[in-house]
Swiss-Prot record:
It is found in: Cell membrane; Cytoplasm; Cytoplasm, Cytoskeleton; Cell junction, Adherens junction. The gene is CTNNA2. The keyword Translocase does not apply. Pfam families: Vinculin. This is Catenin alpha-2. Belongs to the vinculin/alpha-catenin family.
Amino acid sequence: MTSATSPIILKWDPKSLEIRTLTVERLLEPLVTQVTTLVNTSNKGPSGKKKGRSKKAHVLAASVEQATQNFLEKGEQIAKESQDLKEELVAAVEDVRKQGETMRIASSEFADDPCSSVKRGTMVRAARALLSAVTRLLILADMADVMRLLSHLKIVEEALEAVKNATNEQDLANRFKEFGKEMVKLNYVAARRQQELKDPHCRDEMAAARGALKKNATMLYTASQAFLRHPDVAATRANRDYVFKQVQEAIAGISNAAQATSPTDEAKGHTGIGELAAALNEFDNKIILDPMTFSEARFRPSLEERLESIISGAALMADSSCTRDDRRERIVAECNAVRQALQDLLSEYMNNTGRKEKGDPLNIAIDKMTKKTRDLRRQLRKAVMDHISDSFLETNVPLLVLIEAAKSGNEKEVKEYAQVFREHANKLVEVANLACSISNNEEGVKLVRMAATQIDSLCPQVINAALTLAARPQSKVAQDNMDVFKDQWEKQVRVLTEAVDDITSVDDFLSVSENHILEDVNKCVIALQEGDVDTLDRTAGAIRGRAARVIHIINAEMENYEAGVYTEKVLEATKLLSETVMPRFAEQVEVAIEALSANVPQPFEENEFIDASRLVYDGVRDIRKAVLMIRTPEELEDDSDFEQEDYDVRSRTSVQTEDDQLIAGQSARAIMAQLPQEEKAKIAEQVEIFHQEKSKLDAEVAKWDDSGNDIIVLAKQMCMIMMEMTDFTRGKGPLKNTSDVINAAKKIAEAGSRMDKLARAVADQCPDSACKQDLLAYLQRIALYCHQLNICSKVKAEVQNLGGELIVSGLDSATSLIQAAKNLMNAVVLTVKASYVASTKYQKVYGTAAVNSPVVSWKMKAPEKKPLVKREKPEEFQTRVRRGSQKKHISPVQALSEFKAMDSF
């Protein structure tokens, strides 16, 4: 980097012909094309055709001569205007003129005799010399542009030095104003240079340096002002010196990028994918061997050594403080499984040694090996996501606590909170590096490491700003300085958070967030029952933070997709969580804390709090289900612990899972599938009876167009949910656990309540007392059977340990659920029929004109479209004569009773 007093030094060899900008490349390309075309004329050697002048060659020679003349004119103009490199530019122009003349003569002679290899060789040498001369001229012109940029940089450096040497605040304001003007000019010139740079790395470096200059310039004034106002506070000098150093490094970065001499990412340690990811990738590649050349002595030690290195890295992650115990156990189990898979694979290679083709057992062993490494990767990703979910939660709290302590002027307290803040910053950096270690996203890893480096260097300066404020709590300048560093810290944390999110999977994030929210919900319930207000408040805050992060990340993720049914479903789930579920949860937390904090503990509805907490978990789970809707089977396989992982971490005190008795992490649905065959047969009989009742409902609702008829819509919804519940009793369907079945029962109850409201409105308008009483009676049945279904929804398989053998049984609870669903289905069928009859009675007595706003619209469903002309089968081409059918008059009531749709919904 140049100092304010040193001359401008160009880190660029003028003799080098390396093209560094797109402009030089664009200007040179036409001449290269013309010369190449000319050189390649008659490149096939002597021919039997009559010798003579080549019209094409003469035309090309003339175009080369004209292009050379254009370069000469532009070069002379640049040499006149240039303050730097004037002599070099003039010499380059003369060289182009000389080589151009040589090329003109050589090309003319070649055009006259294009079959002469001697003349062709002379022209080729002249062409090379001309291209070199023109390239050198363009590169020198490019250097002149860089020199102008470096001149701007020197002016900015001098202005920066002036700001640093300001003696009072008025002097600082004046000098900073001049610095700002020069900054604007420099930014404009640097932006132009950035667009011209050919090397993407240099463009990135230029952009980063410009960003750093702009970012630190905002802190330069307040840090300098704080130093001038409070020179006796050591922290102010540290702040000022830090900002000056950052600005100087940014200026040096612009200089290096402009000259394409930036330090490489390798030198900065920012390059490459994660170390653990790279090791796993390499291991996966190394296990594919040729049995013909396999040697145990050669390959076994190498593969085992590579695997142990990977396992060492995995062990470090497993032993980290934020890694959950269950996750640690899974990582250890996967490491052991990978070890065993490698030994099995090596054994198969030994069995196949010398064979040309791999046998099936060997291919199976290779597939098993890759599957085990994939499983290990997944557990490592989830472990990292555990860290991210915990560390990147409420990232501003340590900073706000530090600032509040500083405002109070308590320096001792500030130093204590500064240590907490430093540990928080170190944790962010550590977790960010962990995320990098298992990521294959090279560009993303680079951004995360750069952002983490910025966090690491900024942390001490935030503490210095807090120490300044603590020493001078009444000083507005100290407060402004603190605000600037606070804003900068928050921006940098956001940058780091977004960078980390970019290199991690949204599926992993949702899976882990769901588990963590479940843990926190259970902690909240325990704290509530124990009257622990602090734990309740803190854990509820964590739940709100986790939910807010889920909403933010998923909304951002959906911006990557085109709007459609998928995004609508996902955004609908996030909207429900943010606008309905979380406000209710916050309200219940406030009520609980107020009740527990009162001098005399006040009674409150504990179940309301539990329900509100459960809805948060359900909301996040629904978002995850919606996001996974478009995943391929392979992607879902990679998230194969979707079913197991979400439940086996729950405690025995969990309100969510007190009815979910699990066997080795299996879901309740999976356990239902393990019922004895006798019980399965009896359940199948009950399901068959249920299906008969369902077919009646299908036939009834299929008659009607459901647009404008919410009774039909609700009947369909209830039928669909009841089908899922009966499928659960057979170990099938989308419902996995008792909690899912309970949720389904709640949805049916909600639908039943809405149907009750609509049907009662129909009954109120019905003048026929008999029809009205029938309809109300059926509605009472719906309410009764909904309640029964809610009770029976706590269906679970009972697991007994008899003589060391696990015995699974669940016939009674399953048949009760199916019977309740069948009864409810029958009540819904009768309600639909009675609602229609009640509606027709009203219209029959009063006429349709009297109905201003009917409750629901009863319109027959249009039949399926059929071709107007029936296509004959090939074998039925003969003309047929049939007797015309006799027309019959059919009453509307008879038509309605006979109408039956072919397809159930």
